């Protein structure tokens, strides 16, 4: 078992980049694989989750070179060129891989099966299997959870699906199926979710219409190979944004971070809490906005986090809770029940961990209350969740004594270089088994 010890620091200084965006990396493989021609992807995240997606397409006959120095070259086979995988597709810890692949595979002529690790096998899949079945797909789950069995050769028909809650994975799953369906597939969103798939469709020259929260796609299009530069992942940058905000005397710069407006909840929430975050040198990598982030220490205050921020910061809440633990006053969050359905029950994991470190935190069914103060040293269990592990590693920097975090191996799913990157900024994090 891999564990971390994170020791208190004086302050954080320096300049870093973070690995390529995980959401965009997954999608670059998917669309590159079904494109006509070759795609060259730079900035690819070679974490275990994205490698699971890459290997899935290799098993379906797609030639993919790399990753080599974050570059991947994909020799696309076109929309109808995938071959039946010889084995069950193992998505590892990656819900994104499973849900997006399910949409694509539901439209193929061959049968397939998707499985994953112990954590993924507990995650809800009816949210994709039901609308796919409405389209005519034959998708079977095990009591609503993986593994997923998909019978190929089914004729799909477009549907108008009103999203019951914000979910980029469900939306993307249905858009991928809609690329093969008879007629139009329309998806109506009542709350904003990540729009990387829609941007990626444009990058690969596939026609998609977006107006007033309605996305429309049909099968009358092809993806075409392209060159793509992937920005740094704001979900990975979030750990250091919070760290610099709560560690007195800190002053750091994070270069080349994706600032897609469906992902910047972390910046809005921390700014509302009083953080000193400057967004510099704004530009674009293709369809995706990018900037450099300059963060300096500032005393934070507790806030009631608006429900509208939940889908814009869903993956960043564990480390936002660390910021709340260091803020003056109370921070509350509601409307975030989805956090209980992630790689772990993130509300439960954070409440337990914060209480272990002397911070008063209470969990609700859909959120949390945290009374800010000071973080003590101690030992917490990440429950095998990469974001919980990294969040408590950040807490160690400002704790009164070292924080030991157990069960950290899954950090490799999203941020394999986390410890190395952190220590550039003068963290004191050690790994041990």
UniProtKB/Swiss-Prot annotation:
Pathway membership: Metabolic intermediate biosynthesis; chorismate biosynthesis; chorismate from D-erythrose 4-phosphate and phosphoenolpyruvate: step 6/7
Catalytic residues (positions): 315
Binding site for 3-phosphoshikimate: 22-23, 27, 167, 169, 315, 342
Superkingdom of this protein's organism: Bacteria
Primary site of residence: cytoplasm
InterPro entries named among the record's database cross-references: Enolpyruvate_Tfrase_dom, Enolpyruvate_Tfrase_sf, EPSP_synthase, EPSP_synthase_CS, RNA3'P_cycl/enolpyr_Trfase_a/b
Reaction equation(s) it catalyzes: 3-phosphoshikimate + phosphoenolpyruvate = 5-O-(1-carboxyvinyl)-3-phosphoshikimate + phosphate
A biological-process GO annotation: amino acid biosynthetic process
E.C. number(s) listed in UniProt: 2.5.1.19
Subcellular location per the Swiss-Prot or TrEMBL entry: Cytoplasm
Residues reported to bind phosphoenolpyruvate: 22, 95, 123, 169, 346, 387
UniProtKB keywords: Amino-acid biosynthesis, Aromatic amino acid biosynthesis, Cytoplasm, Transferase
One Pfam family here: EPSP_synthase
One annotated Gene Ontology cellular component of this protein: cytoplasm
GO molecular function: 3-phosphoshikimate 1-carboxyvinyltransferase activity
Function: Catalyzes the transfer of the enolpyruvyl moiety of phosphoenolpyruvate (PEP) to the 5-hydroxyl of shikimate-3-phosphate (S3P) to produce enolpyruvyl shikimate-3-phosphate and inorganic phosphate.
Family statement: Belongs to the EPSP synthase family.
Subunit structure: Monomer.
Family annotation (HAMAP family): EPSP_synth
NCBIfam families, per database record: aroA
The protein's name: 3-phosphoshikimate 1-carboxyvinyltransferase
